[in-house]
């Protein structure tokens, strides 16, 4: 299996997750109850309609504990799966499969939950031309995986961290003294991608004049967003952000903004209802 993500050590993640579960004694239940030579076949299935994400990670958990395991992925990453759909079939040593079961399920449930909610937001703005972005509102240590899940749901990734673009927010402006001064300092530092958060229309011109390359229009209602987009006049991409819900996102998308960023797709996504049942091989 090949599954790689930039800025993410998959092996370290798998090892740390299993170590958390196994402690110093290992899976004492499976060791006591399951014969060492026993073999199982299991099927992971969806108990609700979902968008799938994370099956390669489930495979990695099983393969770490049983290098000879046979894994068959029955759907693709980013695919829609209806209620009762089989997602993955796994056959191997029973003890290893039972030991890895919870870790494999946890990550697929979590990432598929994010992908599923993301797809709902993407579908809500279909046809408007606006693009859904995720945010840095992620669980510490899981950002790369959660942003992978939003891509499977149809969103695009915003900044991966503080290192890949400048984002000048209200607290930066408060210290710098003004929007224009904050942007000028970022330009002077040689930063090429400068995102500037504005929450008033009178901040737009100073931000653009100073060298902003992207404007984040924060907590603006649809009429104000439309006016802001008109003032920007296509000079840089625009992004609506702040308090966006499934009920409000389409009206904001129809104002002509380039992007809409939504923290809820990672911060508030419920785990997908996915199960895994085993039987003797």
Regions found by a protein language model. Give the residues of each.
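Acidic/glycine-rich phosphate/pyrophosphate-binding loops and surrounding catalytic core
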Residues: 2-210, 223-231, 237-239, 246, ...
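A Lys-centered signature of the CheY-like receiver
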Residues: 218
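Active-site loop ensemble at the mouth of alpha/beta enzyme cores that anchors a bound cofactor
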Residues: 275-281
């Amino acid at each position: 299996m090949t599954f790689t993500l930039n800025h993410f050590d998959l092996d370290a993640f798998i090892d740390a997750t299993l170590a958390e579960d196994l402690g110093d004694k290992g899976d004492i239940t499976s060791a006591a109850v399951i014969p060492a030579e026993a073999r199982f076949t299991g099927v992971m299935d969806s108990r609700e309609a979902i968008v799938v994400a994370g099956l390669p990670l489930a495979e990695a958990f099983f393969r770490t504990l049983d290098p000879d395991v046979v894994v068959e992925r029955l759907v693709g990453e980013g695919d829609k799966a209806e209620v009762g759909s089989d997602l993955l079939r796994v056959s191997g040593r029973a003890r290893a499969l039972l030991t890895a079961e919870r870790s494999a399920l946890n990550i697929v449930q979590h990432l598929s939950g994010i992908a599923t909610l993301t797809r709902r937001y993407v579908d809500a703005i279909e046809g408007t031309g606006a693009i859904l972005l995720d945010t840095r509102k992620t669980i510490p240590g899981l950002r790369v995986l959660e942003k992978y899940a939003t891509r499977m749901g149809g969103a695009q990734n915003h900044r991966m961290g503080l290192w890949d673009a400048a984002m000048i927010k209200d607290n930066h402006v408060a210290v710098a003294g003004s929007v224009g001064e904050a942007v000028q300092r970022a330009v002077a530092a040689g930063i090429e991608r400068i995102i500037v958060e504005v929450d008033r229309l009178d901040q737009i011109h100073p931000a653009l004049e100073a060298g902003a390359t992207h404007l984040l229009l924060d907590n603006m209602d649809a009429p104000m967003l439309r006016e802001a987009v008109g003032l920007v006049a296509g000079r840089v991409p625009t992004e609506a952000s702040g308090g966006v819900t499934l009920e409000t996102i389409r009206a904001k998308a129809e104002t002509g903004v380039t992007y809409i960023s939504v923290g809820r797709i990672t911060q508030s996504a419920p785990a997908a209802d996915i199960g895994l049942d085993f039987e003797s091989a």
